[in-house]
Regions:
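Terminal targeting signals and extreme-terminal segments of soluble enzymes
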Residues: 1-145
Length: 145
């Protein structure tokens, strides 16, 4: 199995039970080994008291992209630590894009950076996630010698 097919099958398996991302209207725009791009439209229900995207929804989009990137090897991985810096507001009706990219993967630990951008390309937030692999796989895979 190619690494790309493994990433696609891992994403499909995760997506099938990821009701949180689905309920928020997220979509997977791109998946590759160690990488994932997700997007989401900021709805009226996602606005805070300032009339801009609530930071929790921006964080959730970034966290979901991170999850799909670190789980792209058919090895279960969970978040160990996350941090985010908000740089610009997300606007009502705007589609936000989260691009997660692997920076390091050694042993059971991984480091992933996620950039959240607005439709015009401006940077909304920078997120860093640390992952840890755990026992289990997303799907059964025959290993060839």
């Amino acid at each position: 199995m190619t690494p790309q097919l493994r990433a696609e099958k891992s994403a499909a398996a995760m997506w099938s039970t990821d009701t949180a991302s689905q309920a928020l209207g997220m979509r997977i725009d791109h998946i590759a080994p160690g990488a994932a791009d997700l997007s989401m439209v900021v709805t009226a229900a996602m606005l805070n008291g300032h009339g801009i995207a609530h930071g929790g929804y921006i964080f959730t989009l970034a966290d979901s992209a991170f999850a799909f990137a670190c789980n792209s090897y058919n090895q279960l991985a969970v978040a160990q630590q996350n941090q985010i810096s908000y740089l610009a507001p997300g606007k009502a009706g705007e589609r936000l894009h989260a691009a997660a990219r692997e920076q390091s993967r050694t042993g059971r630990s991984g480091v992933y950076d996620v950039t959240v951008t607005g439709e015009d390309g401006r940077t909304i937030a920078l997120f860093r996630g640390l992952s840890r692999t755990i026992k289990g796989h997303h799907f059964e895979e025959e290993m060839t010698p």
